[in-house]
Regions:
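Helix-loop-beta element that forms the nucleotide-linked donor phosphate-binding surface
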Residues: 23-35
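A short acidic, amphipathic alpha-helical/loop segment
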Residues: 2-6, 26-27, 99-103, 164
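Alpha-helix capping/helix-boundary segments
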Residues: 3, 19-20, 38-40, 154
Length: 187
């Protein structure tokens, strides 16, 4: 409710089709719903970015019907989004699933991955976001040049602390490619 009250209804929001519809019903006038692999090119002056919706899944197949749909996003920055100068992947709140294996084929050469971690559990049982092991598994699938864990301690339902991910990263040999940032620190 607090977010709804403070949300600028005129700001552009790129999200899932279902969330775009719900936001429009709340009075947001510039929502864009992207299904998996849909693209949106955005230009402002000479600045260009292509946003590609990547697959995400908030729960196991049976639980998906009870949870909102989610998406990741790939941002291609540069004068020609088809040949980006920089490519960034934001996982969104997903779990590991087979569709993630399509990412390196469809959008290869990811420079930076922002990994939503935390191992969120609903009712203490149902995992709906990646934990430490899942985060490393995603790194192995997507093979980004660099990665930063985010969204790992924002709520009490997060059960997989950042220290667990740091241990898994080191054990998997990814220590030189993963950067750990304190809140407010820049990359």
């Amino acid at each position: 409710k607090r977010v709804q009250q403070k949300l600028d209804k005129n700001i552009p929001i790129v999200t899932t089709p279902g969330a775009a519809k719900a936001l429009k019903n709340l009075g947001c006038v510039r929502t864009i719903g992207l299904a998996h692999w849909d693209r949106l090119d955005v230009e402002k002056g000479s600045t260009r970015v292509r946003i590609t919706s990547a697959p995400g899944r908030h729960g196991k197949l049976g639980a998906q019907a009870l949870l909102p749909s989610v998406m990741g996003a790939v941002y291609d920055f540069g004068a020609d989004p088809a040949q980006p100068a920089y490519r960034m992947y934001v996982t969104g709140d997903t779990l590991i699933h087979d569709d993630l294996k399509d990412i390196p084929q469809r959008v290869p050469g990811i420079d930076l991955a922002l990994l939503h971690l935390g191992g969120t559990r609903i009712l203490g049982v149902f995992k709906v976001t990646m934990d430490a092991q899942d985060g490393v598994q995603l790194l192995q699938i997507v093979q980004p040049r660099h990665a930063i864990p985010i969204h790992y301690n924002d709520y009490d339902v997060f059960k997989s602390p950042l220290a667990d991910f740091a241990r898994e990263v080191k054990a998997a040999g990814w220590g030189d490619r993963v950067r750990f940032l304190a809140h407010g620190e820049r990359y």
